[in-house]
Amino acid sequence: MLIIQDHGFVVNPSAWTDEFLEYDYIGAPWAWSENAYIDPFGNHQRVGNGGVSLRSKKLMDVPNKVVIPWDVNQGDFYKHMNAGLFNEDGNICVHNKHLYEEQGCKYAPVEVAAKFSYERDLPENKGLTPFVFHYSLPPSLR
């Protein structure tokens, strides 16, 4: 399922590759931050922006198979999500990522995610014009 919020667009259809379909979740990479996108085990997560993301049926079915916590009072939820908002991408890709992985879900590595979607300038997407963008255009299209 291709999720596209109202501030995201397909900008480079020729950048599509079936490699994207090898993963159950792929979205624009997040910038590395010392104090953000940290899963409950202390690992920094870099892939997960949901504004424009590709999600498999397997991933979407996980909440039908296991209980996925959705509780802001559990641990330091906001630190894990880097936001005071209740965003599903932080839940799926940071806070509860391990539960999805236990069900066999695969997340794209940063290098593949950078070819899929752009949200902000990062070393991994320098010089790339990805398939889609979320929120701001890649430099090659400005």
What are these regions (language model features)?
Residues 1-2:
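Short aromatic/hydrophobic "clamp" motif used to bind/position activated sugar donors
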Residues 8-45:
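Conserved donor-nucleotide/metal-binding helix-loop-beta segment in metal-dependent transferases, i.e.
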Residues 5:
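Conserved hydrolase catalytic core segment
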Residues 45-142:
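Catalytic core and acceptor-binding pocket of nucleotide-sugar-dependent glycosyltransferases
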